[in-house]
Amino acid sequence: MRTLIGCTLLIALAAAGGGYAYWTEQREVGHYLSDLRVELAINDGVDSGRGNLLGIEAQLSPRDYQSLALLHLKLAAYMSKARDAGLLNDKTIVVLPEHIGTWLMFRGEKNELYQARDLSEAMHWLAISNPLTFTRAWLGAVGESRLNDAHLRMKAASMAADYQTLFGGLAKEFGVTLVAGSIALPDPRIENGTLRAGTGPLYNSSVVFDRNGAAQGKPQRQLLPTYEEQTYIQPSPDHQLNVIDTPAGRLGILVGSDSWYPENYRSLNEQQAQFIAVPAFVTGKDTWQKPWGGYKSVSTPSEISLKPGEVSEGAAWHRLTLISSVPTSTADAGITVFSQGKFWNKHSGGQSFISRNGLTSHDMPVTSARLLNLWL
């Protein structure tokens, strides 16, 4: 009798395990009508043949990341609108928002994930739908928040490949230089024009693709991650900023709040950066209008007199972004690009702006995805 009961239990466990394994392999793409609307919010200057900076403030949601085809559909629609408006040429530098690549961790998942009530539940579905991958990632995780590290690390190889395919493909398809926002990857590197993920700490990095779709230079790692991300995103160990030669001129990149630090502009000055792209990200509903929280990750730079709560988050971004503010920055112009949208219960809502002659453009009401163009 005991033998019979034991065999029955083993059969039941095997059946349950087999059923679970089969369930984890099922991936059905749900029906989703993507919002492809985009408006030209700013068109500053005139075409002098020297190129332009074009920021795409994308409206994004988890459903856009069900497949590369869906995300390509949306981003290609934005870029097609820019091309139809005469804003794309062989000297155009397109800039996308920070973390647009990080969300690729949700590509190709089960419908339960996209239907989750909040981000925490979505992460739960991500883990249980990929049990072996998640377990390996958790065992190799580093930093204070191993869970967040594991969630980002578990699909790093496929995320890097997807990022290369999507953004390198868009750069080639439209014949532009593309600053592909940023992506969180372990020890990213570029080999023969292709982005690869490593096995070390996680870095929030931006990659530039040329008109042939090849990744250029080195991934620009964020020097000073935000206070909220520091438990799993590591600061760049070499504190190095890279300047890349493009058909329009020499381009520097400051990821997110790296644009708040005067010493970073001086570093770009030394490398004769002519333009600066800032892929950026702000979380929280109405955060842009709420009081600025100050420098949380490090001490306030001695040159900065702005105090926490003195102005709104949006006003702080405008004041602390020092592009073309001589003598701190000798760059000719720049652009700061945020995303709009909602990932479950997490909102993103910064307002993109352009910088020229030490001045920034004014905020405007956001009703859809936006294009911001700055002729050089």
Predicted regions and their residues:
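CN hydrolase (nitrilase-like) catalytic-core segments centered on the catalytic cysteine
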Residues: 165-176, 256-372
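N-terminal active-site segment of His-dependent metallophosphoesterases
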Residues: 36-82, 90
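Active-site catalytic loop in hydrolytic enzyme cores
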Residues: 164-165, 185-271, 288-292, 370-376
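Alpha-helical transmembrane signal-anchor/signal-peptide segments
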Residues: 23-40
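Hydrophobic membrane-insertion alpha-helices, especially the h-region
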Residues: 4-20
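Well-ordered, non-membrane alpha-helical segments in soluble/globular domains
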Residues: 67-81, 116, 128-131, 156-165, ...
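Active-site-proximal beta-strand elements of phosphoester/diester hydrolases
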Residues: 48-68, 219-221, 249-258, 277
